[in-house]
Every structure is written in structure tokens, then in C-alpha cells.
Amino acid sequence: MNAVADKVTLEQFRAKYAECKPYYELQDGEPVQKALPTKRHALLQGILYTLLRELGFQSMTELTLAISETWEPTPDVCGQLGPDDGQPYPTKPVPVVIEVLSPEDRFTRVIQKCRRYARWGTPDILVFDPVGREAWHWDIATDDLVRVKQGYAFKSKLVELNLDDVFERLDAENS
């Protein structure tokens, strides 16, 4: 991820970076380019999208969260519950945010993002590593990521995501 030096307003950010790929995120007033996704990243993103739908969430990929004037992230996968509010971007915290690591991602920046999602009130924050075949969830009590061992029980809905299922699907897609 590359950070651009000058601070910008939300309006300036959207005017300059809205159509750029790889995507940019606004982080504390600074445009930060997301890492270029690999094939494995893209496959895992699609699998997580599908699994969230199967678990009863309305899932979306690369959805910009327009909740703050200074921080506008674009998580890899989001999950929502309930009726659509008709807005182009969520303006309130979504129940599920998933980040998929790319080789260039700095883990400290990922932790910072997770901490911000938690401050917003997002109950289910997950991070997946498609290469290391690991996943973490955000733990409010420790204010840190905790490794998912076998499955993750969502807080926003009484369902569970099985980690073996995730990576078995990734293996099947990758073969």
C-alpha cells in the first residue's frame, strides 16, 4: 500500500481517487492505495462472499464504507443484515467486515483498520491470509486480533464459519 503525503477532504478524495484501481482508501485524511490483489486473494474474496451469503448475510465485495469524514475504508468483503436502506454506501457500521491479506499488506496497518472498525461498532471483524491459510478475528477485550482455530461464531447472527470449509473451497478453486 502506498500512502500519498497530503491530507485531503472527503470531497477531494472522492473526486480524485474514486475511479482508481487498485482502489484507494481514505485513512485519517490520507489517500492510501490498497495492495494489488493476487489471484489467490481474489479467489478467497469470492469464496468468503459466497459463504457469507450461505450463512444468511447480504454480502458485498469492495464496498466503500462512508461512515467518517476522515476515514473511508473499502473492505474486501462486507456482510449486512436487514433491509437495504437505499443508500449507495453504508453510513452506519456493517455487521461483518472481512479483510483478505495481500503479500504487500503491513500487518500493523491491518490491525489499525480493525481497531477503527471496532470503534465504529462493527461486531464481526475478520482477517484472512490466503497464503498462510490462517484467519483472525477482532477481540474487543484484548483490543487485538486473535487467531481463529477451527471456526468463528458470529456475534451479529447465530451462525458459524468453518475455517476448514473456507480453505477446502480455496484448494478446490486453485486446483
Residue ranges: model-predicted function:
Residues M1-S175:
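Gly/Pro/Ser/Thr-rich low-complexity, intrinsically disordered segments predominantly at protein N-termini
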